[in-house]
């Protein structure tokens, strides 16, 4: 007889308009049998860490034709996480394995591993890193910068939302290559972090700049070669007029637009023509084949202290709604993680 245990879950109550609130979610207690369904290749896991990511906002509304499905109101939220395998119907995973990938916002989940699920081999680093630098955000930074932007030593690089899960890594990867790097963030604390901890050459608080284009001109008098786009809206407009000829823009996210019922337009797209700019959107899913190569590069750098990563860890599943909502007001410092259990 399979063990049946209590399972705390974070439920989305209804689809969300405007900025999400803690009250859009609720904590619910159910029971779960820690048993793989007969004849399936599912994996039963105990969730250890959950990742709060900006893309999750789009899943809180009814969407069609996107790269991800909407969350189902009345059901647990899903997202990237780190978990321990309790039972497996898939020969690739064994009881006791540590994994990262898509899981439920709950204490225990039954996962179909056809979804992205990676076995964790290197445990000499904090397990929570597999929600960030060694997980989806890390691969996003690596693929977006190295594969989409084709950077060269000595180029000028601008990163928006630069202290977040992805931005802090893009800046460090650019510095490792020998680029001049500037980041923008939304508080003095974050700006200081960019320069003192992550090694950005310069950084500024976009909230204190009345003219974003003038601010960029101040830091990039000769223009920007590469822009890693996380924000959209007014920042993108300001960047376009400050790009160099043949500049590259990797479009990773547009967090300034996610909570608007009417998204803002972009006025300076003509610069794409006059400056021969290449602007490319990308999704990390298309680059997971490079994950082993990425780990080979980044794990030694982490262990040598050459790449650093800042996390903002919330404790307990009950804290997850507040942690997720905080992303959209910039409350988090670094990568937002929820620790569900230590094991």
Curated annotation (Swiss-Prot):
Catalytic activity: an n-alkanal + NADP(+) = an alk-2-enal + NADPH + H(+)
UniProt keyword list: NADP, Oxidoreductase
Keyword Oxidoreductase: yes
Binding sites annotated in the UniProt record for NADP(+): 165-166, 186, 190, 206, 230, 252, 258, 282-284, 332
Alphabetized InterPro entries for the sequence: ADH-like_C (IPR013149), ADH_N_2 (IPR041694), GroES-like_sf (IPR011032), MDR_fam (IPR045010), NAD(P)-bd_dom_sf (IPR036291), PKS_ER (IPR020843)
Enzyme class, first EC level, given as a word: oxidoreductase
Residue sites binding substrate per the record: 55, 80
Record-linked Pfam families: ADH_N_2, ADH_zinc_N
The protein's Enzyme Commission number: 1.3.1.102
Subunit: Homodimer.
Extra facts: There are no hydrogen bonds between the substrate tested and the crystallized protein. The reduction of pulegone shows no sterospecificity and only the pro-4R hydrogen of NADPH is incorporated into the C=C double bond of pulegone.
Job of this protein: Reduces the C=C double bonds of alpha, beta unsaturated enones, but has no activity on enones with an endocyclic C=C double-bond. Shows a high specificity for NADPH as the hybrid donor. Substrates are 1-nitrocyclohexene, 2-methylpentenal, trans-cinnamaldehyde, methyl-trans-2-methylcinnamaldehyde, trans-2-nonenal and 1-octen-3-one.
Protein name per UniProt: 2-alkenal reductase (NADP(+)-dependent)
Source organism of this protein record: Nicotiana tabacum (Common tobacco)
